[in-house]
Amino acid sequence: SVPLVQMHEIGHNLGHSHSGKGGVTYADPTCNMGNKGSWTDGGTNFCFNAAKTWANKWYESYHVMIDPTSNTHDGTLVGINAVKDGTIAETGQDVVLKIASSGETDLYVMFNRQAGANNEVPQYGDQVVITEQYRETGG
């Protein structure tokens, strides 16, 4: 099986559902659960989106929960590789923001740095990406 399928199935084993966009089940080009990478034996080097990263508690020391009714965020978003290569600052730099809502979904925000483990992300590289996720799915 190609690496994209393997990573996608690992995502299911972690409890994740598909990552869609605009009503299309497989459409998120920033996440292995969106099936938008290369379907070759070489695969595509990219990661999971902000909602999945939050649910897995990856880089949890750099997660920030925001209640938009009572606070804001004043900091810098950095890519996941800043943690891995040790260039992240002790304070003021974060990997994932969760913006809690009173509705059925929350928003997750991440800087989709196109480098290292995410150097072949199919779209939105080096951009801030916002993912909307139903709360009850767990990621």
What feature does the model see in each segment?
Residues 1-118:
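Extracellular hydrolytic enzyme modules, especially secreted metalloproteases
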Residues 121-128:
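Short coil-to-beta strand junction motifs in C2/discoidin
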Residues 131-132:
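Catalytic Cys-His active-site segments of thiol-dependent hydrolases/isopeptidases
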Residues 136-139:
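Contiguous ligand/interfacial binding patches
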